[in-house]
């Protein structure tokens, strides 16, 4: 009986997903503001996070056509910006492991996302089309 119980417990632990921290629009805006992100960017960032990851820090995208994946709340691509767990080639412009985007703290993801923004602009995110004209208000968040 003990062996059966341990087997069932092990099976449950193996299939239970790690959910990470899931932010709300306002909790993300406040946290990013605390990390120094300009207030005039916060509505755009919350829109991108909503469409990229549903505000989930543990989000890992499905494989892209070039074999890369996107990681974390802002779905940062491992071919250009972070070192993938597989050890595959990456330009790793943010000088960070992709796994560092999958933690509860968004600070590493925010720093890298700000670099992506500086180098490529908002259009670096394919979901920007949902955030280009109508942005969610963050006025009620502060």
Curated annotation (Swiss-Prot):
Source organism of this protein record: Lucilia sericata (Green bottle fly)
Entry protein name: Lysozyme 2
Known EC number: 3.2.1.17
Molecular functions per Gene Ontology: lysozyme activity
UniProt main location, coarse: secreted
Residue positions with a glycan: 66
Reactions catalysed according to its record: Hydrolysis of (1->4)-beta-linkages between N-acetylmuramic acid and N-acetyl-D-glucosamine residues in a peptidoglycan and between N-acetyl-D-glucosamine residues in chitodextrins
Function: Lysozymes have primarily a bacteriolytic function. Shows antibacterial activity against Gram-positive bacterium M.luteus but shows no activity against Gram-negative bacterium E.coli. Likely to play a role in the eradication of ingested pathogens during their passage through the intestine.
Free-text tissue specificity from the UniProt record: Expressed only in the midgut where it is concentrated around the middle in all larval stages.
Enzyme class: hydrolase
Cysteine pairs bridged by disulfides in the record: 26-141, 47-131, 82-98, 94-112
Cellular localization per UniProt: Secreted
Any Pfam family hit: Lys
CC terms in the record's Gene Ontology section: extracellular region
Keyword vocabulary terms for this entry: Antimicrobial, Bacteriolytic enzyme, Disulfide bond, Glycoprotein, Glycosidase, Hydrolase, Secreted, Signal
A GO BP entry: killing of cells of another organism
The keyword Magnesium belongs to this UniProt entry's keyword annotation: no
Induction details: By septic injury caused by dorsolateral puncturing with a needle contaminated with lipopolysaccharide (LPS) solution.
Lineage: Eukaryota, Metazoa, Ecdysozoa, Arthropoda, Hexapoda
